[in-house]
């Protein structure tokens, strides 16, 4: 089978990137032919498919700011290069991952219009929450945008900025639930919790499947794996939406120590237990 994988970055940057690259390796081992569509970026893995990648955009002041602001809505460069890749590779399936902002869901529409099956693995709550993490201003758990996307404007959830929140609101209006359901055959959620949230957000249950993220057991289980220590271990990015604070608080009531491995905005707070 010919499968086109898409993710905004194509290097081991974060969980979505790691999942995409690991999936590519697994599919190839299973005998499938795989192509990649991502954004141009200096750290990307070298690939012959990069000639189809749209240029890098940076969401900060500069000459490319206008292109960056338009990219979430589907720019001509993305449409042109993605269409060229589809025409040259002729995939049976387009498998999307984290595509918002740098690529945009316009690629799902293009694939659907060509009669190609579209699968979309979700790595956050962007289809439900314009901010993507269901945390109002990065702090308070909030699901109000499930039913009313205007709440992102009311609370200025995007970087406490009215402009950034306005752009996120219009992005969510353009790529609304009805439009995305038409061009996506299956939404894959890595947990039952996310799948339930998608249903609560009004997405068609028939299009929602739960497929947990996988690991390569051969890489995880070494010869000395039986030598276990008396501790729990968290490995991942140390940011508010990961629930690290809650985990550390819960660990105080557990019999073993907690080992935390990772970096991010909360790294300093994890070390000295200060969160401000």
Can you say where each PLM-predicted feature lies in the sequence?
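N-terminal subdomain of nucleotide-sugar transferases
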Residues: 1-43, 87-89, 113-117, 249-252
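Short donor-sugar binding/catalytic loops of nucleotide-sugar-dependent glycosyltransferases
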Residues: 9-11, 214, 235-239, 264-265
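A conserved catalytic-core segment of Leloir-type glycosyltransferases
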Residues: 29-93
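Carbohydrate-associated surface elements
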Residues: 40, 193, 214
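Membrane-proximal helix-turn-helix segments that form the acceptor-binding/catalytic region
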Residues: 113, 126, 142-187, 196
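Conserved donor-binding/catalytic core segment of Leloir-type glycosyltransferases
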Residues: 188, 224-242, 248-255, 259
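Acidic anion/phosphate-binding donor-loop and adjacent secondary structure
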Residues: 199-200, 205-210, 214-230
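Nucleotide-activated donor-binding/catalytic signature segment of Leloir-type glycosyltransferases, i.e.
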Residues: 260-262, 267-276
């Amino acid at each position: 089978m010919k499968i086109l994988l898409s993710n905004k970055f194509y290097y081991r940057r974060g969980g979505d990137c790691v999942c995409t690259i690991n999936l590519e390796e697994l599919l190839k081992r299973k005998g499938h032919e795989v192509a990649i569509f991502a954004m141009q970026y200096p750290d990307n893995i070298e690939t012959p498919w990069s000639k189809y990648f749209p240029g890098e955009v940076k969401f900060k002041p500069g000459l490319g700011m206008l292109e960056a602001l338009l990219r979430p809505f589907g720019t001509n460069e993305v449409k042109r290069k993605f269409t060229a890749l589809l025409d040259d590779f002729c995939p049976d399936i387009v498998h999307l991952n984290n595509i918002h902002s740098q690529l945009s869901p316009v690629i799902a529409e293009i694939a659907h219009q060509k009669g190609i099956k579209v699968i979309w693995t979700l790595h956050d709550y962007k289809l439900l929450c314009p901010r993507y993490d269901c945390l109002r201003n990065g702090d308070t758990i909030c699901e109000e945008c499930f039913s009313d996307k205007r709440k992102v404007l009311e609370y200025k959830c995007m970087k406490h900025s009215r402009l950034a929140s306005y752009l996120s609101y219009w992005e969510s209006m353009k790529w609304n639930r009805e439009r995305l359901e038409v061009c996506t055959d299956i939404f894959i959620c890595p947990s039952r919790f996310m799948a339930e949230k998608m249903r609560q957000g009004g997405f068609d249950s028939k299009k929602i499947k739960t497929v947990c993220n996988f690991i390569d057991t051969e890489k995880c289980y070494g010869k000395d794996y039986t030598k276990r220590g008396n501790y729990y271990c968290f490995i991942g990015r140390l940011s508010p939406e990961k629930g690290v604070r809650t985990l550390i608080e819960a660990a105080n009531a557990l019999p073993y120590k907690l080992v935390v491995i990772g970096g991010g905005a909360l790294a300093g707070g994890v070390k000295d237990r200060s969160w401000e």
